Amino acid sequence: MPKIDLGLDEIPFEAPFRLEFNGSPLVLIRTNNTVRAFVDRCPHAHWPLSDGELKNGVIQCIGHGWQFDVQTGRCLTVPVCSLKPLSVLVHQDRVCIEWE
């Protein structure tokens, strides 16, 4: 299982952060010492979510305006097209992300 380990301070606060790992684009979102991670791709037209705007816990895709709750990945525009959150653990200012 691929794993990323980085410092919490490497992830900007309340701003989408793009990270490439093993050829896969990821978007990390840090809010109140919580970090969420998703594949950096809108399910609608595959625009990078890291280029989108983050406001009030919602990230908006720049392509067609689809909006996603960053805590759950739920699409607020078309609920059947939600994002699948990756497993994230924050411990002692370290962030570990795993996915299959």
Give each language-model segment a name.
Residues 42, 61-64:
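Short cysteine clusters
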Residues 79:
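Glycine/small-residue-rich loop that forms an oxyanion/phosphate-binding "nest" at active or ligand-binding sites
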Residues 1-56, 74, 84-100:
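N-terminal pre-ligand scaffold of iron-sulfur
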